Amino acid sequence: MTFEMLYSKIHRATVSDANLNYVGSITIDEDLMKAANLRVGQKVDIVNINNGERFQTYIIKGKAGSKDMCLNGAAARKVEIGDKIIVIAYATFSEAELENYKPTVVLVDDKNNIELITHELEGGKYV
């Protein structure tokens, strides 16, 4: 049996731009991608904390150090610059792999600077 589980997330990131005329996706600062173990082209869920929107897209790598969190294409209509979002990636694990399961949670400040990287899910504290 396999289980689809939280793999990684960037929590409470601030939308820095919304580019309606781009093909699609979310552009994420390369440093944030590395911290969250995310990859170019990876499917992610986006949850907009401000308006409750939830949708899927894929990742494009942004410039390291840019603090980019830019929704592109149709997804740009689901956010406003300054909105808080959660970027969530899932992965499939076998029952045996779950014995050592530890997702990556990246907490950022209002300017998308990394505040904390943790692998613990403590009673709703980071989820």
Swiss-Prot record:
One of its GO terms (cellular component) is cytosol. Its cofactor is pyruvate. Is synthesized initially as an inactive proenzyme, which is activated by self-cleavage at a specific serine bond to produce a beta-subunit with a hydroxyl group at its C-terminus and an alpha-subunit with a pyruvoyl group at its N-terminus. Its EC number is 4.1.1.11. The active site is at S25 (schiff-base intermediate with substrate), Y58 (proton donor). Binds 1 pyruvoyl group covalently per subunit. Pfam families: Asp_decarbox. GO terms for biological process: alanine biosynthetic process; pantothenate biosynthetic process. Substrate binds at T57, G73, A74, A75. It catalyses: L-aspartate + H(+) = beta-alanine + CO2. Keywords: Autocatalytic cleavage, Cytoplasm, Decarboxylase, Lyase, Pantothenate biosynthesis, Pyruvate, Schiff base, Zymogen. It is found in: Cytoplasm. NCBIfam families: panD (TIGR00223). Catalyzes the pyruvoyl-dependent decarboxylation of aspartate to produce beta-alanine. Belongs to the PanD family. Heterooctamer of four alpha and four beta subunits. This is Aspartate 1-decarboxylase. It comes from Aliarcobacter butzleri (strain RM4018) (Arcobacter butzleri). The lineage of its organism: Bacteria, Pseudomonadati, Campylobacterota, Epsilonproteobacteria, Campylobacterales. The gene is panD.
